[in-house]
Amino acid sequence: MNWLIAKGKAKAKSNVSLAIYRCVDGKPVISSDHLVKLNQLSSGEKQIVSIFSQIYLELDKKYIVLFDEPELSLSIYWQENLLPDILSSGNCMFLMAVTHSPFIFGNTLQNFTVGMHEFIKK
């Protein structure tokens, strides 16, 4: 990692920390007994932490986000909220997802969806 930092290929973010807390009635409870460690997260939850860390830690960047089947390893709740949450970050200038899940676009993005059948010529 130090080699990558020296070559300008990576940045050291030593002043960044991340805390994840469980929610009660939809609100995070900031206490040590509600703290969730990264190794306790599912693979889908780890993907979400990774995506949002990148989007929110690089404040001076705008992203083009492309997903192929973003629903993999995600609960229905996260399938419904992932794309709207990314767009609401203010750091996403373009978003495209290819999915089999009806939950990914079954939200405020419904009007922006296009089915593959619309491109099939008969």
Predicted features and spans:
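Amphipathic alpha-helical domain-onset/packing element
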Residues: M1-K13
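Switch/communication elements of ASCE P-loop NTPase nucleotide-binding domains
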Residues: S14-K122
